[in-house]
Amino acid sequence: MRSALRIRPLMCAAIAAMACVFSATAQAQQPVCSAWLIESSRFMNVPFGSFMPDRSFVPGSTKPESNIPTVDLPVNIGVIKCGTELIVYDTGWKQQEYLKMTGSDHWAPLPEQLKVLGFNAADVTKVVIGHAHWDHAGQLSDLPNAVLYVQREELKAIEWALNYPEPHIRAVNSDPGGCNRTPACGYMPLTIEEVYGKVLKGKAVIVDGEMEISPGVKIHPAFRAHTAGSQLLEVPTAIGKLVFGSDAFSSYEGIRDWMVANVQQTDSVQQFLAYEKCYKITGGYNNCVAAHEPLSYTDKYPLTKNSWVALNGGRMAELTLAPGEKSRKP
């Protein structure tokens, strides 16, 4: 009996050790992805304080946080290659009246931008939108074979925003498709056609919370961090995990220094919780991929510094490569 009791702890220790080995092996076998960043377009001369209240311009100030009146904001798209899987996170936009009314420049079609990286738009297998606003979900139809991943909460928010009776609150769509600055602004007619075009064609997965869409590639909900159905995308890479945040973290400076950004529809507490989630997943802030950071494609945003100028003055960056993946930088 005593001998059996002595053997049992040894067996338990052996089983635990084997479990650790199997876990480490599984992690080692997890696909490592390559990732790039594409600038869909650029909002020009945006008052810095309207994007980040903590960076509001103060005339005559010598403080670096308050002496910049305007900034140019990129609209960033993530391109992720995991083995044979090609995933796009956010799509930017193509609706020319929307680009014109927002003073945007440096736009180029997403299929042409993908060609610069050596990809075909028809080969994109999955597209995840951080949320369904006009500058993030406007080119879904240009990825004909991609399955859309969108949160159910986001679709519910679209319906609510378009139908709410009080015009100061609902998403007001004015001729020729403009958007008055309401709390629900951003769900534009031509953009909603893009989103529901995928849904109606049976090319959409409606997500409820968290979901793994490919080995190691995980959607995380960030509800109300920008919109009701905001979502993040975790991606395993050779430099650690990346988290693409769309407007849940619009700004690298914001997530680094804990400042809210792009707060038009944002619950600031939920935005900070999205920041925290990226810290927990990646171990810090350097691998958090922001949607509109003015410092994108420069050394001041280190993840994006391996960059170049591409179509129509728009920029691209090679974030990280999987083992054996050749650089696509010209």
Feature annotation, model-predicted:
Residues A26-F119, D123-K126, E153-P221, I239-D247, T266-Y285, ...:
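Metallo-beta-lactamase
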Residues S104-V150:
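Active-site metal-binding motif and surrounding structural segment of the metallo-beta-lactamase
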Residues M11-V21:
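Bacterial N-terminal signal peptides
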